[in-house]
Amino acid sequence: MADGVLLDTSFLITLADKNRDHHETARRYWQHFVENDITIYLSTIVVSEFSVKQAIPPDILRCCIVLPFNWDDALRAAALDWKRVRPEGVERDALKDDIKIIAQAAIADAAYVVTADERSFYRFCETFKSASEISFKPIQLAAGFDRAAFDVNGQSDFEDMLGEGR
């Protein structure tokens, strides 16, 4: 049974940078994951991308299960039809890491992937999900924090709705 959440690089960057749009939403999701003992997966690909600018804080790392990119992940990435999700004018090289992270989430049987990248990563996930190529639910930070993403009945929390002025 699927469980846990895989963090996309853009989520981690947004969580780390108080000046980025959606930082507060990222912080609330992180707090929700930790307080509710939701398994948090961290891809070595995300580690590689994030570590270009800064080290991952030890308190973040301690909460995560690190996923190395392995044989099964590679085969799943190769099987995903990346040509269908490629935006006009974007070369394959720009998509490779996103496809690998998506494949890792599928192989890890994550229930969710959380991202701040709604323009490409989120869109790729939605396209693959609608084609039944993945089963996890993508969560985008731009939509705001919503506990309903984790509720089997899709029930939002009234306090959360009041806090975000919905």
Q: What is each stretch, according to the model?
A:
Residues D17-R20, I45, E88-D93:
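Short, flexible loop segments at the rims of nucleotide/cofactor-binding pockets, characterized by
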Residues M1-D3, E24-A26, F33-L42, D73, ...:
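A generic "structured core" feature
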